[in-house]
């Protein structure tokens, strides 16, 4: 084995370009507008650190996203609180070339379980959405997907490493979803989708806990 068990790993199952474009383990967001889609993990930028009390803040320089007939200027801030198992990620829409336009923001996490380049058996993983209704998927590599508008949490439990990973969102109107992988792309996906407009801020939290 090459590392401790991981869900997202920099060397193995690594990022956007691993195996299948967009199917490596990654925590990112996609912006969609009129059939076009751009992933923020493909937008290089710089960042700087600051600290407020016990919270360290990573502020990324704004990136400009160009669609055919719309330009969006977006800034990301990430918050790491000492002693916490939660990471807060904020997306700020700073400017739009058309202030009345609306884009779809898809905050997502793609992950799998393993210690090497190849994932372990994920058959015991359980995906779940909590909210106005509860939906679950018992992992069977069938490429299934479920979604709930107004979801309070989307989560995955990995019994082999006694881990529960989840995402929550700042807007109760956002749609939470979970996606199951398949044999040649076994990773699972947790995410939230929301329509967002000029000057709006949308926050999500990536949460890690011990599963009993």
Stretches found by the model and what they are:
Residues 46-57, 79-85, 122, 129-132, ...:
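Short, ordered beta-strand-loop transition motifs
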Residues 1, 19, 116, 142-147:
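Short linear motifs in intrinsically disordered
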Residues 1-107, 111:
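Catalytic and substrate-binding regions of extracellular carbohydrate-active enzymes
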Residues 112-124:
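Short aromatic-acidic-glycine turn motif
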Residues 99-104, 108-110, 129-130, 137-212:
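Beta-strand-rich recognition/accessory modules
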Residues 17, 24-26, 37, 55, ...:
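Compositionally biased, intrinsically disordered low-complexity regions
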